[in-house]
């Protein structure tokens, strides 16, 4: 069980890289992009968010993992052909459109009167974004982050194809690892009786995953409701 949790934590840690990239792209689309670029980019981002994860899994196994091995050898590091780093990087790429689209919707929903008031006081556009828009949209942005992370926690195919199924107790992202979801798949593959220990372990792992994602989704929903109610109080 500990190995599964450690593997899940390593993959989540790598996915955090996607959060600033998604947020920066959302800020650009909401505040800087011309209307033509926004009208083109927004549907493309939403299409990217709908790509099947098995495609990302193939990309991780056939492109990213070998590149990481080559880079590791160049730096004198011992990198496995299947590593938590490869899976985490690709899952980070996978959730960038998700974070970007949700954060863009939240930033766009900030009342225009706040922007106008900031400009009237002499603030620049960048100062308005940092000191007015982002603080106002912060609950919704954090909610989008949590929803994206809970989406990534339940990912299976990328981890199976890029990080292996080996239950390895390590904090080294360059080694093989496994997550809760991949172990559920492994335990329930083939003919197993309901009272088989492997089946019971799979149910325990599934219950753990359910409560973790339930907590993240609930917290994200509460933050989103705070964001929605704040403009009405203003």
Model-derived segments and spans:
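Single conserved hydrophobic/aromatic residue that forms the stacking wall/gate
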Residues: 1-7, 11-12, 226-234
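Transmembrane alpha-helix signature in integral membrane proteins
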Residues: 4, 8-28, 145, 215
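Transmembrane alpha-helices
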Residues: 102-103, 107-111, 119, 125-163
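Loop-to-helix entry region at the N-terminal start of transmembrane alpha-helices
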Residues: 4, 8-9, 69-98
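Periplasmic/extracellular loop-to-transmembrane helix junction in inner-membrane transport proteins
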Residues: 4-16, 34-35, 186-199
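C-terminal transmembrane helix and the adjacent membrane-cytosol boundary/short C-terminal tail
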Residues: 104-108, 112, 119, 146, ...
């Amino acid at each position: 069980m500990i190995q599964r949790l450690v593997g899940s934590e390593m993959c989540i840690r790598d996915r955090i890289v996607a959060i600033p990239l998604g947020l920066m792209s959302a800020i650009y689309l909401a505040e800087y992009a011309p209307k033509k670029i926004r009208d083109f980019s927004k549907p493309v981002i939403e299409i990217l968010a709908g790509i099947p994860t098995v495609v990302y899994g193939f990309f991780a196994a056939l492109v990213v993992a070998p590149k990481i091995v080559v880079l590791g050898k160049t730096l004198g590091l011992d990198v496995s052909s299947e590593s938590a780093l490869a899976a985490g990087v690709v899952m980070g790429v996978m959730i960038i459109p998700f974070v970007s689209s949700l954060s863009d919707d939240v930033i766009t929903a900030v009342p225009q009167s706040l922007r106008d008031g900031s400009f009237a006081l002499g603030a620049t556009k960048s100062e308005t974004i940092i000191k007015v828009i982002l603080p106002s949209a912060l609950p919704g942005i954090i909610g989008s982050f949590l929803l994206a992370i809970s989406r990534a926690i339940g990912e299976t195919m990328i981890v199976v194809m890029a990080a292996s199924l080996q239950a390895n107790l390590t904090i080294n992202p360059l080694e093989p690892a496994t997550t809760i979801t991949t172990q559920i798949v492994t335990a329930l593959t083939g003919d197993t009786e309901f009272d088989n220990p492997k089946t019971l372990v799979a149910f325990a792992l599934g219950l753990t995953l359910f409560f973790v994602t339930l907590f993240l989704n609930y917290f994200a929903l509460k933050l989103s409701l705070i964001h929605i109610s704040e403009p009405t109080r203003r």
